[in-house]
């Protein structure tokens, strides 16, 4: 198959997956919460007006629709403009960064939402769960072993290629970058396990599920990042760099999929967001 045609197909898939399917799944989840857990019955779930949250959800949808249009325009530009392919990978990368902007907005909104919830419930008392938290409480030793083995394979692969003295090869700088990524993920995991509670109402069981989901996501992304780094190095070593833009787009598919692993709503205890009944004399 023609490389350009394959790039158009993969990029079209990236547009629809990251800017249509992913937001659609998230919006269905949000509107399901609005419908099944309304403010009148679950007032603690809404520190601000539900209309404000609905407007934010609408803005998120509109932003993604505009990014879809931009993506289709990008494919058209690829088709009609003569190019060498040298900048295709960079263009696909920066388009994904644009696709990420609405989701970054959701993350910032989530931080503001939890801050408002804490400010309104500063006197809330939560029962402490006296249980030590270890990484293996949230993820299996087998999964950790897989992550470690893939990291060791990556280090060994870099060491093997380093002996050929490729002028373009960064050598152990690649190991430093990947190791830095692992350390950054480790810092996020540490904050999640031992940091300040974001949601003052959330039950311990729900928080444990959230932490478990986050850890699985980050370790899965760490695996994806490491494998992608090996693929990119291999494409350069074997002289098939024309596929770089395609592989980075496929990589973004994987990142999008891994980011979409949310706890099921029916597993969440929403009763904690109800008003406590008044005591009768």
Predicted regions and their residues:
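N-terminal leader/presequence-like segments
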Residues: 1-86
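Membrane-water interface of transmembrane alpha-helices
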Residues: 18-38, 100-123, 183-201, 260-270
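Alpha-helical transmembrane segments and their membrane-interface junctions
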Residues: 58-85, 144-182, 222-255
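Alpha-helical transmembrane segments
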Residues: 2-20, 85-105, 167-187, 245-254
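Cytosolic/matrix-facing juxtamembrane and C-terminal tails of multi-pass cellular membrane proteins
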Residues: 188-281
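Juxtamembrane inter-helical linkers in multi-pass membrane proteins
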Residues: 31-46, 115-134, 194-212, 274-281
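Internal, hydrophobic cores of structured domains that mediate oligomerization or house catalytic pockets
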Residues: 85-159
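Short, Lys/Arg-rich cytosolic juxtamembrane segment immediately N-terminal
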Residues: 50-66, 132-141, 211-217
């Amino acid at each position: 198959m023609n490389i350009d045609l394959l790039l158009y197909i993969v990029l079209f898939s990236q547009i629809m997956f990251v800017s249509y399917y992913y937001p659609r799944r998230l919006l269905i989840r949000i509107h399901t919460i609005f419908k099944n857990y309304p403010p009148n019955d679950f007032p603690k779930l809404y520190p601000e007006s539900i209309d404000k949250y609905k407007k934010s959800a609408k803005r998120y949808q509109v932003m993604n629709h505009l990014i879809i249009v931009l993506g289709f325009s990008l494919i058209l530009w690829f088709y009609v403009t003569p190019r060498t392919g040298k900048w295709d990978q960079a263009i696909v990368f920066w388009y994904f960064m644009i696709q990420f902007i609405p989701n970054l907005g959701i993350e910032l909104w989530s931080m503001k939402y939890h801050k408002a919830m804490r400010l309104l419930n500063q006197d809330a008392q939560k029962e402490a769960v006296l249980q030590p938290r270890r990484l293996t409480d949230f993820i299996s030793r087998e999964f950790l072993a897989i992550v470690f083995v893939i990291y060791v394979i990556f280090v060994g692969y870099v060491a093997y290629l380093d002996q050929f003295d490729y002028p373009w090869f960064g050598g152990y700088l690649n190991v430093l970058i990947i190791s830095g990524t692992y350390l950054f993920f480790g810092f996020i995991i540490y904050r999640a396990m031992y940091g300040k509670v974001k949601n003052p109402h959330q039950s311990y069981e729900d928080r444990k599920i959230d932490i478990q989901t986050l850890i699985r996501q980050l370790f899965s992304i760490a695996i994806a990042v490491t494998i992608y780094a090996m693929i990119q190095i291999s494409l350069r070593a074997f002289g098939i760099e024309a596929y770089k833009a395609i592989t980075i787009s496929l990589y973004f598919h994987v990142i999008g999929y891994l980011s979409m692993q949310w706890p099921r709503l029916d597993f969440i205890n929403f009763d904690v967001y109800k008003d406590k009944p008044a005591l009768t004399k």
